[in-house]
Amino acid sequence: MNQPCNSMEPRVMDDDMLKLAVGDQGPQEEAGQLAKQEGILFKDVLSLQLDFRNILRIDNLWQFENLRKLQLDNNIIEKIEGLENLAHLVWLDLSFNNIETIEGLDTLVNLEDLSLFNNRISKIDSLDALVKLQVLSLGNNRIDNMMNIIYLRRFKCLRTLSLSRNPISEAEDYKMFICAYLPDLMYLDYRRIDDHTKKLAEAKHQYSIDELKHQENLMQAQLEDEQAQREELEKHKTAFVEHLNGSFLFDSMYAEDSEGNNLSYLPGVGELLETYKDKFVIICVNIFEYGLKQQEKRKTELDTFSECVREAIQENQEQGKRKIAKFEEKHLSSLSAIREELELPNIEKMILECSADISELFDALMTLEMQLVEQLEETINMFERNIVDMVGLFIENVQSLMAQCRDLENHHHEKLLEISISTLEKIVEGDLDEDLPNDLRALFVDKDTIVNAVGASHDIHLLKIDNREDELVTRINSWCTRLIDRIHKDEIMRNRKRVKEINQYIDHMQSELDNLECGDILD
């Protein structure tokens, strides 16, 4: 696979090369010369041709953020890289290079046409992100395993495929295998696939295809289930009660509690622990369900607030448009009258009247804006009070429920301590009938040791409960603060933008009036 430009020295993709390429492919007449003088912004370039330049490495393309078509064929590129910012790329030609591995395409989600013809590629992979891929050219490479074809089944839009002059293209079943496993393909190696060939291929590989479809359906169902679980977890996180709809918190209390796990083997502790867990989980589920309900209330409150703000802004804008329309109708009529007037005193008087109308419009628009600012400020303050109260009530009730968890832990601790002391006394007196595991028996050397072990277990459990409560309170308070800050900042930005728009419009009207010089009018 000889490259046509290997006799030249390898070149670097620097700014000079890119500027030259952009200039060469632009208009060559007067418009092109003007564009070269003023400079062409890379971000405005939609197509870039960099073939036959002996490029060794792809680099410095990050500014071409709106590029749609990139031609890099007939170079000596060894690695696909440097394309991360080309998210809008639709067409990419990397044919006639020295590429061995498909990589670096993860951000090209809009790519439809990819050519890797005449490289050194031996495996088809790492194309998962190219969900819109329609045309794939991989001819004249080193692909020798037909299983690579199965990988391409995931590309539902793929209609054209080229794999000629690969080792697999020499296989007797090459065409039939591809037609069977890629039934939506329309062109293979630049030739249209007829319906008869498709039917023969399907019949020949029907059993294997059916088995593969079954496996794909199972995998798809699993992926959908995992996605549903992720979405559900995200919903729970939004409500700040993730992992509280079961025994997760309780289990985490014992996950790092070796003493507690050992003590669970004491006679009578198993039943005690089971009762404790059941009651504890009920409280956690209550927190979880309460959290979801409160999240819905907060969402409703936020949606209502957003709708009120939108309606207020829209109504205010409509009033402003009506005032501007009325002004412009009169203003255009006045300008026409000024141009037709021949007497200078009358012209000056009419210009003063127009200027007064402009000032009156400015006052009216600014008054509308000030009214809107006051209206939105009142709405925002009311929303802030409501959401803060809702968050405060939520925290208060959660803390109350968490206190019940601590009460259960304290009760369990007392019972466990009683059983432990009783067991110690039986061991000392030799009345213990049950055999204890060695790790557990090691705790019963004296009263201090067993009391410390029970106490350490208790401390771990309380810490887990406290940490989960603190995490919930901290996160929802942070959410509330960020939300309110964002709302205030958005309103400030909206107001500044609107005032700027009003001033620009008024300045334009006044400038237009000022340019009506008496000499021009009389002429």
UniProtKB/Swiss-Prot annotation:
Limits of the LRRCT domain: 166-204
Transmembrane intervals: none
InterPro entries: Cilia_flagella_integrity (IPR050576), Leu-rich_rpt (IPR001611), LRR_dom_sf (IPR032675)
Pfam family, one: LRR_9
Keyword Repeat: yes
One CC-aspect GO term: axoneme
Coiled-coil regions listed: 208-242, 366-391
Keywords per UniProt: Cell projection, Cilium, Coiled coil, Cytoplasm, Cytoskeleton, Flagellum, Leucine-rich repeat, Repeat
Location(s), subcellular: Cytoplasm, Cytoskeleton, Cilium axoneme; Cell projection, Cilium; Cytoplasm, Cytoskeleton, Flagellum axoneme; Cell projection, Cilium, Flagellum
Superkingdom of the organism of origin: Eukaryota
LRR repeats: 44-65, 66-87, 88-109, 110-131, 132-153
Similarity annotation: Belongs to the DRC3 family.
Assembly: Component of the nexin-dynein regulatory complex (N-DRC). Interacts with DRC1. Interacts with TCTE1/DRC5. Interacts with DRC7.
Described purpose of this protein according to its UniProt entry: Component of the nexin-dynein regulatory complex (N-DRC) a key regulator of ciliary/flagellar motility which maintains the alignment and integrity of the distal axoneme and regulates microtubule sliding in motile axonemes.
Protein name in UniProt: Dynein regulatory complex subunit 3
Source organism: Homo sapiens (Human)
Gene name per UniProt: DRC3
